[in-house]
């Protein structure tokens, strides 16, 4: 019998009132008695703290705080301690008689939070003689002691031999040791377990029915059934793992795709950049060489352009100098042309004005004669009109006087007076003082004759004056002509000058006639002179271009030489063109061939890569397509053999899997129908009863029962008979054995044991001999052993099957690779290397390019010589026709001579043109200049005097006529005579008056008409004079302007001036054109020089940069190559087919791969950082580092147990094979792992039945418990209706819900939860997931409802609730429940700890005064029956009869508080006995 462990003592060190106190604990009940505040609760608190040192759970509330949700701030612990180090220790002895001291070191933490620091520890191997107080205290003197800190305690214990001290950093480790050593009943793995344990202790401490426990009775009482649960969990874990593995395989397949994608993109990213750098390095080297060649060529071109620039600049300076002279000459010629044109226009105006003046002169002379005649007639009309007027006046006067005389008597006297007046007037006018009326008639005749004589004399003088006036006019005309030609001179010199001018005019006219021939001659000579100058210029230009001076005689020979050179150069150029065409044609053919080879090279390289991969994979060398096809046939044969062997291993593996599955059935049943029959018959499988048989006994029992080892044990065979009728769903042989499954033994058979065999006497006449099986399968241990061996065999078979599958798939993939190679690359794989041919063609192309370059240089020189020769011949062709002009040295002198003669002729022509008309006019009248008509003025005066005399004579004749006419008046002597005479006179006067008035009117009309006509004549004369004077002035101005112009205006002058101007303009234009050409050429040359200079600088800069870049890149490239070779990735990166792509294509390829890689490594921080660093274009080695990092990353993810290679590419290929094999294997495994819903229902039902039986056993132990009116206590266990329905559906109607259990998307737990929801739609599942609900449904405890019932008085069995019971009854019932929980925990934990350990049992009860004596006695009885220790606290009036009682009294002495303790042990039948350690504890150390 295993002894139960016991708590020996409780030690409090430095607690409030207890400095160093050890309470020895009774084996059953220890009672703490004392008044209020005596320290009972403090003692219990120290015990609980040492038992559960978890500050998150500890809460020591006062009784008055019962039901409160919060207590004091320190939860009752801080105030129970003293300052300094405190201890609470439990001294125990377990079933192995091992003394174990467990405890805690407590210490108050300074601060307002009133915290406590707890350190748990344990002491093993302590001698029984050593008391706990001796360990933790050090005696200073008789009255003082000191508490040791934990480190000193550790040192002290380590110094003791055989003593082990353990300090724990976690409560879990502390409780784990206490469980292993049998101090606590249950393993407290988690905070939840600790909380349950604390709630149990707390419930016992404060008494009553704890709602926290009764609500969770299933968690406290029912074991977790970890085996079944673990089976379910293992099954689900296996399924989950299987599915996760399948999902992982799918993920891995996607990872494989990712890996392939990562390797592909990384290879593209790095290889493209690697090959681009390789290409760029080659290109940079070529560019550096090209830059160097271009630099040399540019320097030569710049030197040539500089020489050319100097020549053109010199020629431009010459043309600029010549242009100034030509511009001056052209401007002078233009001005001369303008002057000639102006002179011609002036000459035309002069001639026009001279013609107009001649015409005006004639008209003016004619008009002068008309005006003179008109003046004479006007004077005559005026005289006639005046005479008629005088006569009329006279007659009127006479008639008036006569009328007056007739009116008055004095009329005669008046007439007489008038006659006397007329006589006196006549005397006065005629100067005849002796004139009388009688002599008047005689004198009238005299004076009339005198008048006639005066008139005749006047007419004669008038005729003479007209003639003199004409002579005077011719002389003035001739004189004016001489003055106009020669200038002012004396009148007497006019004759001589006129004759000289006429002779000079003849000479000038002769010279003027030579102007046109001289002009033509001069024009011809000037043209020849210009041609001579042009020929000299061409010769000078030719000599300058040829760089040598030539004589005129050498030009013809030079012309022939140049023509011969042109012919030879033309042939050379033609031959060079044909040779160049041949070279270029060959070059194009080479280029075309290289292009075709470059297009074929990537295909050939891809074929070679594929061929090399095939060679590496199969380890064969292929030299022809026939080798490939032959090896493919061998590969097919090998594949068939591997498939046959794989199928054989697979069949054996399936057989092993089936056997493992059969042996893995719960209860050892190999037939699922037996489980259903056992449940139906209410029995138990025999294999399940003997499930715990050891491996050593398994062969015996297997042979003992023989074929009946699969029998069903039933309580009563008679009750099974009715079930056997019509039974068909069962094995062929069904064995039924009657017996109690709870106490079944093998006594039903008579057995004789032999060597490795048994003889079973079934009946008197029937024995059975059975040998011990070599591989027993009876009992769980035997099955597990067999399953283990089968698993080992299965592992070997699986590994072999995996190897064969891998080989088959590898062979198949190799076959596919060969098929792809034959379909894609076989046609080109064994052709010649295009790259070698490309290299040969490139070398030939370089030779052709060099030959073409040399040929171009030679051809360029020949072309330059040809062009120079052509230019020379062209220039000579223009010069040779003018050789005679170049030899004529006197041409310029002749031109000057003719020009002088032409100037003289032109001067004469101008003289003739200017004075020719005057000389022509002067010539016929020159003779009038011999005598000067100076008497013209005297004649003019005589004529005027004659006119006056004629006028006076007329007046005298008129006066005498009047006297004669009034002669009658003188005879009036008296009035009679006057009257008689007056009548006749009146008539006569009137007649004469009428005649005189008529004459006067006629005279007036004639005078008026002649006056108007004279006025018109005068106006015409004035107009003509004005026009003549104006034109004369204009003519003089024009002649002066013509003289000022100083140009001879003739008919050919304008033409010559225009020709000269046009020639100069043509020369100027040619010069300007040439100058513009030179300027443009010079500008172009300068631009070309600038471009060449910039190009030269750029080429120098580019060359040095490129050279530096090449040098720098060489170092970087060496580092890259070293890194590539060190890491062995050159084969992956040096992809020759990429060498045929352009840099842009490679960069695009690299950039696309970079974008894909950024997405691919987004979740990998290391690769992401390395990729980001590799993006630096200046550090190509970082891309290699990234590639190496990718390979390393993939290598780390290669399972070396599956894939035996370091190459990720090969690993991916092997991974594809392995993943496909694993997918098949795991799919079949999932089908085998899946458990049926009927099996689940059977397992849960059996577990429920077993636990119901266990609860019934526990109830038997509580039947005799009574407290007050409570006669008995029991636990009632029922299956929930909803869960019972679920079990029925799982076992009977599971086919209807296969959509849940056959779903690959749902685990079994999730399918179970979905089914539960489907069956109970009215139940709200809350926020719980189907997985959580399913896991709860797999726990049988959730199928049960548990409640505590009490048999109380007359009420019978009713539910145990605090409201229905008294305080004592509730405390007793609660204590009974706690005892049941503790017992259940022990049963549950028995298989977890050693078989030789029975754990301690201890509960608490504070304030036990609420129980009566009968109830306390019941507690004592319960503790005795269950071997349980109990610590109760009660007031002083409680005196238990059994156990140990401590009386506690708190005292204060000299401001020091301590508890006085007295211990008593059992006083009823025995004498009181003072327990050890009951003396007062020493005072605290000062």
Curated annotation (Swiss-Prot):
Disulfide bonds: none annotated. Keywords: ATP-binding, Cell cycle, Cell division, Chromosome partition, Coiled coil, Cytoplasm, DNA condensation, DNA-binding, Nucleotide-binding. Residues 666-783 are annotated as: Flexible hinge. It is found in: Cytoplasm, Nucleoid. It comes from the Bacteria. ATP binds at residues 34-41. Residues 326-418, 444-480, 509-603, 835-923, 977-1115, 1209-1266 form a coiled coil. GO terms for cellular component: cytoplasm; nucleoid. One of its GO terms (biological process) is chromosome segregation. This is Chromosome partition protein MukB. GO terms for molecular function: ATP binding; DNA binding. Belongs to the SMC family. MukB subfamily. The keyword Transmembrane does not apply. The gene is mukB. SUPFAM superfamilies: P-loop containing nucleoside triphosphate hydrolases (SSF52540). The lineage of its organism: Bacteria, Pseudomonadati, Pseudomonadota, Gammaproteobacteria, Enterobacterales.
């Amino acid at each position: 019998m295993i002894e139960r462990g016991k708590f020996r003592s409780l030690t409090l060190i430095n607690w409030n009132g207890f400095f160093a106190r050890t309470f020895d604990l009774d084996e059953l009940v220890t009672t703490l008695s004392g008044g209020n505040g005596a320290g009972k609760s403090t003692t219990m608190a120290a015990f609980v703290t040492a038992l559960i040192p978890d500050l998150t759970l500890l809460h020591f509330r006062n009784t008055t705080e019962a039901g409160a949700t919060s207590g004091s701030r320190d939860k009752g612990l801080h105030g129970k301690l003293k300052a300094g180090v405190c201890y609470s220790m439990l001294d125990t002895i377990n079933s192995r008689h091992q003394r174990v001291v467990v405890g805690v070191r407590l210490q108050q933490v300074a601060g307002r939070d009133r915290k406590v620091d707890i350190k748990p520890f344990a002491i093993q191997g302590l001698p029984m003689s050593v008391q706990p107080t001796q360990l933790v205290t050090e005696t200073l003197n008789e009255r003082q002691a000191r508490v040791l800190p934990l480190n000193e305690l550790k040192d002290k214990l380590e110094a003791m031999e055989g003593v082990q001290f353990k300090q724990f950093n976690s409560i879990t480790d502390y409780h784990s040791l206490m469980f292993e050593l049998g101090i606590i009943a249950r393993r407290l793995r988690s905070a939840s377990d600790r909380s349950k344990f604390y709630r149990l202790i707390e419930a016992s401490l404060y008494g009553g029915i704890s709602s926290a426990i009764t609500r969770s009775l299933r968690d406290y009482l029912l074991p977790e059934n970890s085996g079944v649960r673990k089976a379910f969990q293992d099954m689900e874990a296996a399924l989950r793992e299987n599915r996760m593995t399948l999902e992982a395989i799918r993920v891995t397949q996607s990872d494989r795709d990712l890996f392939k994608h990562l390797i592909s993109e990384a290879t593209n990213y790095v290889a493209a950049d690697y090959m681009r750098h390789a290409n760029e390095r080659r290109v940079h080297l070529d560019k550096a060489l090209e830059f160097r060649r271009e630099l040399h060529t540019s320097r030569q071109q710049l030197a040539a352009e500089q020489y050319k620039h100097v020549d053109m600049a010199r020629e431009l300076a010459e043309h600029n100098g010549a242009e100034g002279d030509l511009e001056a000459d052209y401007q002078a010629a233009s001005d001369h042309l303008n002057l000639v044109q102006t002179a011609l226009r002036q000459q035309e105006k002069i001639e026009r004005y001279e013609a107009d003046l001649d015409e005006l002169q004639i008209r003016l002379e004619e008009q002068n004669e008309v005006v003179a005649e008109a003046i004479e007639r006007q004077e005559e009309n005026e005289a006639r009109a005046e005479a008629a007027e005088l006569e009329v006046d006279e007659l009127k006067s006479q008639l008036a006087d006569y009328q007056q005389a007739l009116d008055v008597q004095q009329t005669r006297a008046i007439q007489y007076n008038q006659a006397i007046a007329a006589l006196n007037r006549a005397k006065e006018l005629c100067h005849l003082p002796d004139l009388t009326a009688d002599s008047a008639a005689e004198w009238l005749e005299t004076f009339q004759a005198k008048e006639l004589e005066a008139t005749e004399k006047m007419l004669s003088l008038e005729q003479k004056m007209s003639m003199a006036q004409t002579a005077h006019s011719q002389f003035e005309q001739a004189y004016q002509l001489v003055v106009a030609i020669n200038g002012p001179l004396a009148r007497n010199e006019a004759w001589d000058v006129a004759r000289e001018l006429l002779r000079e005019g003849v000479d000038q006219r002769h010279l003027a006639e030579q102007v046109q021939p001289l002009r033509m001659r001069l024009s011809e000579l000037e043209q020849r002179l210009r041609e001579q100058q042009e020929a000299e210029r061409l010769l000078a230009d030719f000599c300058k271009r040829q760089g040598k001076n030539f004589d005129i005689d050498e030009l013809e020979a030079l012309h022939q030489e140049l023509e011969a050179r042109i012919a030879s150069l033309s042939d050379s150029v033609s031959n060079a063109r044909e040779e160049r065409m041949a070279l270029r044609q060959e070059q194009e053919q080479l280029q075309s061939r290289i292009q075709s080879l470059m297009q074929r090279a990537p295909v050939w390289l891809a074929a070679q890569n594929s061929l090399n991969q095939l060679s590496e994979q199969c380890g064969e060398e292929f030299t022809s397509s026939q080798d490939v096809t032959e090896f493919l046939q061998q590969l097919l044969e090998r594949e068939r053999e591997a498939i046959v062997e794989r199928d054989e291993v697979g069949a054996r593996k399936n057989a092993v899997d089936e056997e493992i599955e059969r042996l893995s059935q719960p209860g050892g049943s190999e037939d699922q129908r037996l489980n259903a029959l056992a449940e139906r018959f209410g029995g138990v499988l025999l294999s399940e009863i003997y499930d715990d048989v050891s491996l050593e006994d398994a062969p015996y029992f297997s042979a003992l029962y023989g074929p009946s080892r699969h029998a069903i044990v039933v309580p009563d065979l008679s009750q099974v008979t009715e079930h056997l009728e019509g039974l068909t769903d069962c094995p062929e042989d069904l064995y039924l054995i009657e017996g109690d499954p709870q106490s079944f033994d093998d006594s039903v058979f008579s057995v004789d044991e032999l060597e490795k065999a048994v003889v079973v006497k079934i009946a008197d006449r029937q024995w059975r001999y059975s040998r011990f099986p070599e591989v027993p399968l009876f009992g769980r241990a035997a099955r597990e052993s067999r399953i283990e061996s089968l698993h080992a065999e299965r592992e070997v078979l699986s590994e072999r099957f995996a190897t064969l599958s891998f080989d088959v798939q590898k062979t198949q993939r190799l076959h596919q690779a060969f098929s792809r190679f034959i379909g894609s690359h076989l046609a080109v794989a064994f052709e010649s290397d295009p790259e070698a041919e490309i290299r040969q063609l490139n070398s030939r192309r370089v030779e052709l390019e060099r030959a073409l370059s040399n040929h171009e240089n030679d051809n360029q020189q020949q072309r330059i010589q040809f062009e120079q020769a052509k230019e020379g011949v062209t220039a000579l062709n223009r010069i040779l026709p003018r050789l005679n002009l170049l030899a004529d040295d006197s041409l310029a002198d002749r031109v000057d001579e003719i020009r002088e003669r032409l100037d003289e002729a032109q001067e004469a022509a101008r003289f003739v043109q200017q004075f020719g008309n005057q000389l022509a006019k002067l010539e016929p009248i020159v003779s009038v200049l011999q005598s000067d008509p100076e008497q013209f003025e005297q004649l003019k005066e005589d004529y005027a005097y004659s006119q006056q005399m004629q006028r006076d004579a007329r007046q005298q004749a008129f006066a005498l006529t009047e006297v004669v006419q009034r002669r009658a008046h003188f005879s009036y002597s008296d009035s009679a005579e006057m009257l008689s005479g007056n009548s006749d006179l009146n008539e006569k006067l009137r007649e004469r008056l009428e005649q005189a008035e008529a004459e006067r009117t006629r005279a007036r009309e004639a005078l008026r008409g002649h006056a108007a006509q004279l006025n018109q004549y005068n106006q015409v004369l004035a107009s003509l004079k004005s026009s003549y004077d104006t034109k004369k002035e204009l003519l003089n101005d024009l002649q002066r302007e013509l003289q000022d112009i100083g140009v001879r205006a003739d008919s050919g002058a304008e033409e010559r001036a225009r020709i000269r101007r046009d020639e100069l303009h043509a020369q100027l234009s040619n010069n300007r054109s040439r100058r513009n050409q030179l300027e443009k050429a010079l500008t172009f040359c300068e631009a070309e020089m600038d471009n060449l200079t910039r190009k030269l600088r750029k080429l120098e800069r580019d060359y040095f940069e490129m050279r530096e870049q090449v040098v720098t890149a060489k170092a970087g490239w060496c580092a890259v190559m070293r890194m590539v070779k060190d890491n062995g990735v050159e084969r992956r990166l040096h992809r020759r087919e990429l060498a045929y792509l352009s840099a842009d294509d490679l960069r695009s390829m690299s950039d696309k791969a970079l974008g894909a890689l950024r997405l691919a490594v987004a979740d990998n921080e290391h690769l992401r950082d390395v990729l980001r660093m590799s993006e630096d274009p200046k550090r190509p080695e970082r891309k290699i580092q990234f590639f190496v990092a990718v390979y390393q990353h993939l290598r780390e993810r290669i399972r070396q147990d599956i894939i035996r290679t370091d190459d990720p590419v090969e690993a991916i290929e092997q991974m594809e094979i392995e993943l496909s094999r694993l997918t098949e294997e795991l799919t079949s495994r999932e089908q085998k792992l899946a458990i049926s819903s009927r099996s689940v229902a059977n397992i849960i039902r059996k577990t429920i039945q077993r636990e119901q039986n266990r609860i019934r056993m526990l109830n038997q132990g509580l039947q005799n418990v009574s407290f007050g009116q409570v006669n008995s206590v029991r636990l009632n266990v029922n299956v929930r209706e909803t869960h019972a329905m679920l079990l029925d559906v799982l076992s009977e109607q599971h086919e209807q819900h296969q959509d849940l259990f056959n779903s690959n998307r749902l685990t079994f737990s999730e399918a179970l939860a979905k089914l539960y929801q489907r069956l109970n739609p009215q139940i709200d599942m809350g926020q719980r997931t189907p997985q959580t609900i399913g896991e709860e449904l797999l726990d049988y405890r959730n199928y049960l409802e548990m409640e505590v019932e009490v048999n109380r008085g007359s009420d019978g069995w009713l539910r145990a609730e605090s409201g229905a019971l008294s305080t004592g009854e509730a405390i007793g019932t609660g204590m009974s429940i706690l005892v049941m929980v503790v017992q259940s925990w022990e049963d549950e934990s028995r298989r977890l700890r050693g078989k030789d350990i029975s754990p301690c049992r201890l509960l608490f009860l504070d304030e036990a005064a609420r129980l009566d004596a009968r109830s306390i006695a019941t507690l004592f009885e319960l503790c005795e029956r269950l071997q349980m220790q109990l610590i109760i606290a009660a007031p002083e009036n409680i005196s238990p009869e059994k156990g140990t009682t401590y009386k506690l009294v708190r005292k204060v002495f000299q401001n020091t508080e301590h508890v006085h303790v007295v211990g008593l042990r059992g006083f009823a039948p025995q004498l009181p006995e003072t327990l050890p350690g009951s003396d007062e504890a020493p005072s605290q150390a000062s």
